[in-house]
Amino acid sequence: MDQFPESVTENFEYDDLAEACYIGDIVVFGTVFLSIFYSVIFAIGLVGNLLVVFALTNSKKPKSVTDIYLLNLALSDLLFVATLPFWTHYLINEKGLHNAMCKFTTAFFFIGFFGSIFFITVISIDRYLAIVLAANSMNNRTVQHGVTISLGVWAAAILVAAPQFMFTKQKENECLGDYPEVLQEIWPVLRNVETNFLGFLLPLLIMSYCYFRIIQTLFSCKNHKKAKAIKLILLVVIVFFLFWTPYNVMIFLETLKLYDFFPSCDMRKDLRLALSVTETVAFSHCCLNPLIYAFAGEKFRRYLYHLYGKCLAVLCGRSVHVDFSSSESQRSRHGSVLSSNFTYHTSDGDALLLL
C-alpha cells in the first residue's frame, strides 16, 4: 500500500521512461473527497464502536470469550478511526503534520488496521471451534484464553504494522516513507505484498473455511432457525469481500505501477482516482463491524434499549421505562432450540447467536 494517505502536494508523477504526468486535478478531487468521507467514517465509526465498548464494559453478566474478542475488535476500530481526523488535517493543511505526529498517526493507523482484520479472523475461528468442534473446544474457550489470545493478536498487529511505519517521517510537508537507499525499491513492494496477503487474502481464506464448515454443521441441524444463522454468516463473508477486495486490487495494481506496468499518464490518473474511491469503501468497513458482530446479539440490543430509556429520561426530565423484556424473551425462546444444539458443550452461550 502506498504511504497513507496519498500525497496531496505532489502534482506530478515522474517516471524514468516517461514524461511528467500532471495529476493536480486528481489531487484536488482526492483532497475534498477523502476529507469529507474520513470525517463521516470517523463520526459513525466512533459512535458505533464506543457503544460496543460501553455495552461490554457496563454489562453485569459474566464476560465470555466472545465478549473479549468483540471488545478488542471495537478497540482496534476505535484506534483506526481515531487517526482519521489527523489524516484529514494532513490533507487540507499545506504544512502537513509534525514529525512526531506523523510517526504516531501512521503507527496507530496501521496497528488498528491490522488489529481489526486479525480480530475479525479470530472471531471466525472462535465460532468454528464453538460450533464445529464444540465438544473438543470446551476447555479452551475461556475468558483467560481469550485474554491471552487477544494479547497475542495485538502483538502480531504491532509486528506486522511495523514495516508500514518504521521509516515514516515528515519530509517537505509530506508524511512519507524515507527508506534507506538499499531498500528504496524493494520496501514499498514488500509493504504492498504484506498488506495484500496478511491484511486480506489469508484472513479471507480462513474466514471462508471456518464459515463453510459452520454452514455444513448448521445444515445437519434440524431447526427452522438455521436459515437466519446461515444468512448472517454469508453476510459477514460477503461484506468483508465486497468492501476490501476493490481496495486490495488497487494496492496490487499500485505494486505493478512500481514496475512501470502503467506508463500511460491517463492510466496513472485513473489508478490514483480509483485508489481514493476504493480506500473510502474499505475503511468504512469499521463502521459496519458493530452492526454485524455486536448489535445482532441480545445483550447489545438490551443495552441500546437501556441507553434509549436514559436519553428519554434526560430529555423528558423524568424516569421513562422502556418495556422490551417480553419481546426479547419471546425471541429468545424461539431461538433457544438452535442454540442448545451446540452451546451445551461450550462455555459461551453467545457463540451461535453472534454469528
Curated annotation (Swiss-Prot):
Gene Ontology, cellular component aspect: cell surface; dendritic tree; external side of plasma membrane; macropinosome membrane; neuron projection; neuronal cell body membrane; perinuclear region of cytoplasm; plasma membrane
Disulphide bonds in the chain: C102-C175
Residue ranges of the TM segments: 32-59, 70-90, 104-125, 143-167, 196-215, 232-256, 274-297
Residue positions, PTM Phosphothreonine: T346
Induction per the UniProt record: Expression is down-regulated by miR-27a-5p microRNA in natural killer (NK) cell lymphocytes in response to TGF-beta1.
Any one GO molecular-function label of the UniProt entry: chemokine receptor activity
Annotated coiled-coil segments of the chain: none
Gene3D superfamilies attached to this UniProt entry: Rhodopsin 7-helix transmembrane proteins (1.20.1070.10)
Biological process per Gene Ontology, one example term: negative regulation of microglial cell mediated cytotoxicity
Location within or outside the cell: Cell membrane
Connected disease: Macular degeneration, age-related, 12: A form of age-related macular degeneration, a multifactorial eye disease and the most common cause of irreversible vision loss in the developed world. In most patients, the disease is manifest as ophthalmoscopically visible yellowish accumulations of protein and lipid that lie beneath the retinal pigment epithelium and within an elastin-containing structure known as Bruch membrane.
PANTHER family on file: CELL ADHESION MOLECULE, CX3C CHEMOKINE RECEPTOR 1
Role of this protein: Receptor for the C-X3-C chemokine fractalkine (CX3CL1) present on many early leukocyte cells; CX3CR1-CX3CL1 signaling exerts distinct functions in different tissue compartments, such as immune response, inflammation, cell adhesion and chemotaxis. CX3CR1-CX3CL1 signaling mediates cell migratory functions. Responsible for the recruitment of natural killer (NK) cells to inflamed tissues. Acts as a regulator of inflammation process leading to atherogenesis by mediating macrophage and monocyte recruitment to inflamed atherosclerotic plaques, promoting cell survival.
Assembly with partners or alone: Found in a ternary complex with CX3CL1 and ITGAV:ITGB3 or ITGA4:ITGB1. (Microbial infection) Interacts with human respiratory syncytial virus (HRSV) protein G; this interaction modulates host immune response.
Protein name, entry field: CX3C chemokine receptor 1
Origin species: Homo sapiens (Human)
Name of the gene encoding the protein in the UniProt record: CX3CR1
